[in-house]
Regions:
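C-terminal transmembrane helix-loop-helix hairpin of multi-pass membrane proteins
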Residues: 1-8, 125-213
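Interfacial helix-loop-helix linkers and transmembrane-helix boundary segments
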Residues: 24-29, 51-55, 75-84
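A generic, lipid-embedded transmembrane alpha helix
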Residues: 31-55
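Aromatic-anchored segments of alpha-helical transmembrane domains
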Residues: 38-47, 90-98, 140-150
Length: 213
C-alpha cells in the first residue's frame, strides 16, 4: 500500500477511537483560527490541480484536515460534532474505496454506495435520535458531493449515486436506532416492573386489570 493510504487509515482509526485530546489542545488554541484554516483547506483542495497518481504532497491537506476534524470533534457542540465526524471520516474512507474500485463496473461497486454505507455506520454510532441520524447522513453526503462538483470528478455518477446514497444512508441509519430505542424501553419497563411488582404489563407498561371476585 502507498504511504499516504496507510497514514489515512491510521489517522481514521485514531479519529474514531477518540484519542489525541491533549495533542489537539496543545497544537490548536483558537477555535476561530482553526475554523478559518479548515475552510481554507477545503478551498485549496477544490482548486488543487493534483490528481491521485504519483503526487506525495497530495496527502498533506488530508492529514491537516484530519487533525482539524479531531479538534472540532473535541470542542464543538453535539450536532456539529456528529456532522463533522460523519463527513470527514466517511470522506477519508471513501478515498480508500477509490483505490479499491477506481473504475466501478457494477451498481453495487460504485464508490458512492460504499461511502453511503460508511456514512450510515457513522450515523448509527454518533446519532441519538431519528432526526439527527437522517440529518447527519444527508449533510455529510451533500458536503462530499459539493466538493466533487467543484473538483470536477465523477460528474456522471453524481446524480443517481447521490440519491442512492441518501436513501441507503437514511434507511440503514434509522432502523438500528429505532430497534435500540425499543429495546431500551422494553428493558426499562421490565426493570420498573421488577421494582414495582407484577402489577404492570411487560409490553405496554400499563397496570393490569384485576377482576374482583
Amino acid at each position: 500500500l502507498p504511504l499516504g493510504i496507510v497514514i489515512i487509515m491510521v489517522a481514521t482509526i485514531f479519529l474514531l477511537a477518540g484519542h489525541g485530546q491533549e495533542l489537539c489542545f496543545t497544537l490548536f488554541l483558537s477555535r476561530k483560527w482553526t475554523l478559518a484554516l479548515f475552510f481554507a483547506l477545503i478551498l485549496s483542495y477544490m482548486v488543487s490541480p493534483y490528481t491521485f497518481e504519483g503526487v506525495s504532497i497530495f496527502w498533506v491537506p488530508y492529514l491537516l484536515l484530519l487533525s482539524f476534524s479531531v479538534y472540532l470533534l473535541i470542542n464543538l457542540s453535539h450536532p456539529l460534532r456528529s456532522i463533522f465526524c460523519s463527513a470527514f471520516t466517511a470522506f477519508c474512507i471513501f478515498i480508500l474505496s477509490l483505490f479499491i474500485s477506481p473504475q466501478p463496473k457494477g451498481y453495487i461497486y460504485e464508490p458512492f454506495v460504499i461511502y453511503s454505507l460508511v456514512c450510515s455506520l457513522l450515523s448509527i454510532v454518533f446519532a441519538y435520535s431519528r432526526s439527527s441520524a437522517i440529518f447527519n447522513s444527508i449533510v455529510s453526503i451533500l458536503v462530499f458531493n459539493s466538493i466533487l462538483i467543484f473538483r470536477g470528478g465523477y460528474s456522471t455518477l453524481l446524480a443517481p449515486s447521490a440519491f442512492t446514497a441518501a436513501c441507503l444512508s437514511c434507511c440503514i441509519s434509522v432502523v438500528p436506532i429505532l430497534l435500540s430505542q425499543k429495546i431500551t424501553v422494553f428493558r426499562t419497563r421490565r426493570i420498573f416492573q421488577t421494582e414495582a411488582g407484577s402489577s404492570l404489563h411487560p409490553l405496554t407498561g400499563k397496570k393490569r386489570k384485576r377482576f374482583k371476585k
